[in-house]
């Protein structure tokens, strides 16, 4: 049973908070996007927490990647089958990652990249190592253009900014 973070009981909240501090927080790196820090490459189908940040009269975009080693859910003790989603926990703690900024909007996002590669065109006829060729093909796919933005949460200004940065249309985003 998926339990929203807001509905956790005190003991469960303490369990999740400890798990976050000990397991997840040390793995996170918050990135502030500005003229000296360009928009990062977002991996295909990887979860990110994104935030629209304000410092005085300046707005910035903040992004935190969720490493693959972080489990997607946290089981809750004392409630068999009950869990909270990792992205829900991350959004709850996001303000602490961007301490000097005011978080105006936040959402969990995922980008889907184009996967349209031609096997025949990508194969080097001189290199017959199929595994190496497939690995090369998969690395190329990671760098292809985004075709979809998925967002969990209502954040219209953040959505607009992300669509602009990813060069996507509103029809290519799903909330």
Per-range role (PLM):
Residues 1-175:
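N-terminal non-catalytic structural scaffold regions of very large proteins
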């Amino acid at each position: 049973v998926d339990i929203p973070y807001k509905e956790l009981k005190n003991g469960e909240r303490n369990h999740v908070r400890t798990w976050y501090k000990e397991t997840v927080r040390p793995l996170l790196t918050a990135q502030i996007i500005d003229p000296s820090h360009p928009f990062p490459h977002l991996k295909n189908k990887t979860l990110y927490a994104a935030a629209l940040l304000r410092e005085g009269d300046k707005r910035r975009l903040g992004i935190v990647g969720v490493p693959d080693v972080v489990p997607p859910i946290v089981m809750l003790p004392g409630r068999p089958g009950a869990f909270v989603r990792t992205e829900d926990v991350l959004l709850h703690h996001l303000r602490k990652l961007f301490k000097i900024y005011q978080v105006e909007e936040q959402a969990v996002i995922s980008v889907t990249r184009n996967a349209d590669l031609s096997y025949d065109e990508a194969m080097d006829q001189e290199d017959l190592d199929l595994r190496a060729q497939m690995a090369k093909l998969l690395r190329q796919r990671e760098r292809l253009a985004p075709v979809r933005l998925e967002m969990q949460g209502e954040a219209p200004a953040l959505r607009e900014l992300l669509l602009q940065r990813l060069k996507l249309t509103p029809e290519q985003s799903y909330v």
